Amino acid sequence: MLGFYNYTVILTYIGLLVGFGGILSAMGGNTLGAILCLMGSGLCDMFDGKIAATMERTPSEKQFGIQIDSLSDLVCFGVLPAVLVYQSNEHSAWLCGGYVLCALIRLAWFNVDEQARQEHTQERRREYRGLPVTTAALIFPVLFGLEQFFSLSFSVSAPVVMLVTASAFLTPFRVKKPHFERRNMKRL
């Protein structure tokens, strides 16, 4: 079989399946279910790299991990939020398509940049250029929660937030990468 199936990529695969469940939830009109899946995908993405770093991997396994993570991110943090917003406001189709395109470009840029970075150093990444697409796992759930709390309309504010977020994906400002201390995780 093509691909890699060790524990270093399993959480990425799980995150993708959770994201796909979120797309189905959004298409079925279950906004809360879609938001919860978006958050679940975000949790999987938060830890998949840390888990992968615990294993000595071949260069092919490392490159596969980068690619599969970005493909999963496109579905979970590009397509899922776009479907979620489109379901709440069907007049936002072009905006949602543009958001997915911006997420795709941002992820492709990251992959090229990460490959070049890894050719020069094995140090951990300290910053990103442009807003990482994974921030969608925080932005849209917070927006949804605020709208529930203040009884506002997700269908009105979500497209505006989506436009700003998509623009931030491609704007070359620097974002410091949060680092959490890795305790009790040994290399295998």
Residue ranges and their predicted role:
Residues M1-I10, E61-S70, E123-G130, F180-R183:
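Short, amphipathic, aromatic/basic-enriched membrane-interface segments that mark the entry/exit
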Residues H120-L188:
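C-terminal membrane-associated helical module and adjoining short loops/tails
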Residues G21-L36, V75-G97, V142-P159:
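Helix-coil boundary and interhelical linker segments in multi-pass alpha-helical membrane proteins
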Residues L11-F20, C37-G40, V75-G78, G97-L104, ...:
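Lipid-exposed faces of alpha-helical membrane segments in multi-pass integral membrane proteins
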Residues M1-G49, A168-L188:
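Topogenic membrane-insertion module of multi-pass membrane proteins
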Residues T8-Y13, T54-F110:
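Multi-pass membrane catalytic core of lipid/isoprenoid biosynthesis enzymes
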Residues F47-Q63, F110-R126:
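Cytosolic, membrane-interface loops and tails of multi-pass inner-membrane proteins
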Residues D45, V100-Q115, L163-P178:
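Transmembrane alpha-helical segments that form the membrane-embedded catalytic/substrate-channel core
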